[in-house]
Each structure stands twice: as C-alpha cells, then as structure tokens.
C-alpha cells in the first residue's frame, strides 16, 4: 500500500492502549486522562510485574499515561525475557515472541526513521527501545554471551550521551552495528564551532 507521511502528535501517543482496549471487545470511552485503575493499565502493571519479578512504583509520564518505576536490574530482567521468551512464564511466551518479531519487522515504527532504535534493529539481532530522560532498554537475541537483557540510564538525562553509550555498549558485548552517527559525535558551541566530542568509555563488570 501507499506509505503515509505524518507528524506524530498527542493523539498518537495512546493508540496502542486504545487498540488493546478494542481488541478485547470493550467499548471505547473518551477519557481526559489515562488512569491507573483502567483495565488496560491494570493489565500493563500485571504484565510488567510478572516479567520483572517486582512490584513497580507508579507515576505519570510525559505522554500523560501511567508509567512504572523499576530498578535497572529488574528492567533488564524483563528485557531478557523479551530476548528469550522461552524463559518467561508460559502465559507470556507467545505474546513476547509476537511483540519481539513485530518490532524487528517494522523497526521504523518504534521510534521513526533515522533513530538509534531503528538503526540498531535493522543491523543487529536486537530489540531496542529508548525512553525518556536518558533511559534505554535492549533485548539481545544472540551474541557471544547468548541472549541478554540490558537497561541503561544516563544520570543527567542527556539524550545524545545515551545513544553514544548504547552503541559503545553493544560493541563491548560483541555486537558491532558498523559506522553510526553516534560514534564520537561533535559538540558545538553557539557559533556552530566544533569544540569537543562525546565518547563512551566503558568498564563492564559481570555480576
């Protein structure tokens, strides 16, 4: 079919929630805000709890929907199960596989053309998903250490530093995406002069 170009806006941020609600044959009602006790949000919470092994904290994110607070270790556990659905509780194995394969078939629908998510999923056996304020999650389907789940957070929330760190981390784990825009990207001042660059120096410690 014909591709449609559009600029994602506020109305697109809750599309997956509405689609899930309709898939369950429930009437769609208009709500000014997404609420944590809505059936879809309760299902999201239960799913994340089952996959992370922890009870997440709750807040409201930039899209005005309930969001969850987890330690990086627990988030990485959930991404590991996305990488290796056969290790997940039985009820989640097929859904995880479907989500994983859908994201890998259509990586440009995850974060848009030109994003680090899209590039990594096009080039490597990974599922990649960025989040707000320097957050990143990775499911490595294969590699020198087998399937892995990774959760990363840049403490000050810097977006560009996150991308640089993710690419460097994948290389350190034996998955090289090749040349990317996030290899030593320049830092420029207000006049546009290059005054430095960003570089990730990693020291991995396995626990």
Model segments located where?
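Active-site-adjacent helix/loop patches that line small-molecule binding or acyl-intermediate pockets
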Residues: 1, 13, 22-24, 30-54, ...
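Alpha-helical structural signal
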Residues: 11-14, 100
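Surface-exposed beta-strand edges and their flanking turn/coil or helix-capping segments
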Residues: 21-23, 31, 71, 75, ...
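A generic local secondary-structure boundary/capping motif
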Residues: 36, 48, 64-67, 124-127, ...
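Bacterial peptidoglycan biogenesis and beta-lactam-recognition machinery
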Residues: 38-60, 66-67, 73-111
């Amino acid at each position: 079919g014909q591709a449609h170009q559009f600029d994602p806006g506020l109305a697109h941020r809750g599309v997956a929630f509405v689609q899930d609600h309709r898939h369950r044959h429930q009437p769609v009602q208009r709500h000014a805000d997404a609420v944590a006790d809505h059936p879809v949000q309760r299902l999201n919470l239960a799913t994340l709890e089952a996959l992370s092994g922890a009870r997440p904290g709750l807040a409201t994110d930039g899209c005005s929907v309930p969001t969850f607070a987890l330690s990086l270790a627990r988030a990485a556990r959930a991404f590991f199960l996305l990488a290796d659905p056969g290790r997940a509780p039985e009820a989640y194995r097929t859904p995880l596989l479907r989500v994983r394969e859908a994201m890998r078939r259509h990586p440009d629908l995850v974060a848009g053309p030109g994003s680090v998510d899209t590039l990594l999923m096009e080039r490597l056996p990974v599922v990649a998903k960025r989040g707000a304020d320097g957050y990143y999650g990775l499911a490595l389907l294969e590699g020198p250490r087998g399937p892995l789940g990774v959760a990363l957070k840049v403490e000050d929330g810097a977006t560009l530093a996150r991308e640089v760190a993710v690419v460097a981390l994948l290389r350190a784990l034996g998955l090289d995406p090749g040349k990317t825009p996030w290899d030593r990207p320049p830092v420029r001042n207000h006049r546009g002069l290059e005054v430095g660059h960003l570089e990730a120096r990693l020291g991995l410690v396995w626990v």
